[in-house]
Structures are given as C-alpha cells and as structure tokens.
C-alpha cells in the first residue's frame, strides 16, 4: 500500500485513535502520580522534559491535557511538587504562582526578589531546565493563577504606600537616574526604585516577553538568538546606603564616582 503521510494526518479515524491514546496515556500517568509518587517522580526525572516540550511545542494547545502532570522544585519544601500542590498551599491573598529561572536552585533562592517572595510566606518554583520558562510562559496561567517570573516586571508585592513613595523618589531623582543610564552606556533601558529589596542595594529585572534567562538560552542556539534580547531594568533600593552615596555623588557633581558605582 502506498499511503502518504499527509493522507494519514488528515484521516478522521487516525485522529480519533491518536486522541484516544493521548487520553489513555495521560490517565495512566496521572494514576501513577496519585498512587505511586516515588515511581512517578522517577518517571518525571527521566521524561518530564518531554512533557514540558509537549506543552511548549504546540503553543499550549495541549496544556489542559498535560499541565497537572508537571512538577517543579519547591524552594519552601525543598522537593518536587505539582502545580496543584503549589496552589493548595497558597496563603490567603496570594494571587500568582511565582517562579525563578536559572542554572542552579541554590543561586536562584538567593536572588533579591526570591527572598522577597519567600519572606511573604509564598512558595517559589525553581526552574532549572532550559524549557521551563518557555513552557510556563506559553501556559500563562494555571487554574486562573498567573505565572510570574520574579525577575520580570511588577510582582504585585508592594503596598500602596510603598508605590506612592517609590514614585515620589523616582521623580525627585530623575536626573540621577538619567546619569546612571548614561554611565551604563545602553546596557539597561531604565532605572527604577524598588522599596521591597530589603537588604539588597540593587536588582536587575527585565520587561517584555523575553527574560534574561531566555536571552541566555536563545544565544546558545544555532542562529545565536539574533535580535532576541531582554529589556533590562536596574532597580535601586532607596533605603540602602548605596542609593544615598549615589545621590550624594550626583549632588556634588562627582560623575567619576557614579561611573564607578555603575
């Protein structure tokens, strides 16, 4: 028989068989997750990457089928958890699922915004595989809880008073911020005030659809990720001594000192 691949792909019965197999395999995997956690985690460590690619590869069309099989490492519990388990333990008032992307779990947990999220009593998913962030971004949310990368934009953790104070500080130091941008010579798009940085003097975040970790991954691809760069924002802690030193240097016209800090 000479049957083309295109003919098979369009055949209604083949589609029906494929969908039936997908559901059967999914149900078997979910039963393993529920009834034999140790066995499922062994399976996940071997094949979890393929499930994530299954969600990302078809632009999220199968996310409803596969998303409850996903597992990520929990910063609070120090073990693999599902998205359902994350949501079940969310404190009242938490509106998003927070995650960090990077190479090492230990390093991610020390990031300024990671410590902020954890200090609020919220858990943090530590995503160390290159496909993780692409998968979560294409999903956008899970059970109406939006995924938020801790290093991408507003985390929604500031109080109204903190927001107002940050706006006032930014207005008062507009010229200083422009000088810092100039000193960094195009490496950042903007300078902002972030009063939630606790003991950290600065933090680097990104805006838009491409994060700093995604940029690193894209650069490793054959095309080199040409034109796929993250939009970086320097965040300053207005309550830290470094900010005070920058202000003093600006007021004194000490450009060299600002360049040194930058």
What is each model feature region?
Residues 1-262:
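Conserved GHKL (Bergerat-fold) ATPase module
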């Amino acid at each position: 028989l000479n049957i083309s691949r295109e003919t098979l792909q369009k055949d209604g019965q083949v589609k029906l068989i494929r969908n039936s197999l997908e559901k059967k395999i999914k149900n078997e995997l979910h039963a393993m997750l529920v009834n034999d956690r140790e066995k499922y985690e062994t399976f996940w460590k071997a094949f979890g990457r393929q499930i994530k690619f299954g969600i990302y590869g078809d632009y999220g069309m199968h996310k409803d089928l596969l998303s409850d099989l996903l597992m990520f490492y929990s910063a609070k519990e120090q073990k693999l958890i599902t998205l359902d388990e994350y949501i079940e333990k969310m404190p009242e008032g938490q509106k998003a699922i927070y995650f960090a992307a990077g190479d090492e779990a230990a390093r991610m947990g020390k990031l300024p915004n990671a410590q902020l999220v954890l200090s609020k009593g919220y858990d943090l998913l530590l995503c160390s595989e290159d496909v993780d962030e692409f998968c979560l971004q294409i999903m956008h949310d899970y059970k109406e809880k939006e995924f938020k990368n801790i290093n991408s934009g507003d985390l929604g953790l500031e109080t109204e008073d903190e927001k107002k104070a940050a706006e006032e500080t930014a207005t008062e130091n507009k010229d200083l911020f422009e000088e810092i941008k100039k000193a960094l010579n195009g490496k950042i798009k903007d300078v902002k005030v972030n009063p939630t940085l606790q003991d950290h003097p600065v933090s680097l975040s990104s805006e838009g659809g491409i994060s700093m970790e995604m940029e690193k991954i894209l650069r490793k691809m054959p095309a080199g990720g040409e034109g796929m760069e993250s939009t970086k924002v320097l965040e300053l802690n207005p309550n830290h001594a470094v900010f005070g030193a920058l202000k003093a240097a600006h007021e004194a016209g000490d450009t060299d000192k600002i360049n040194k800090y930058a």
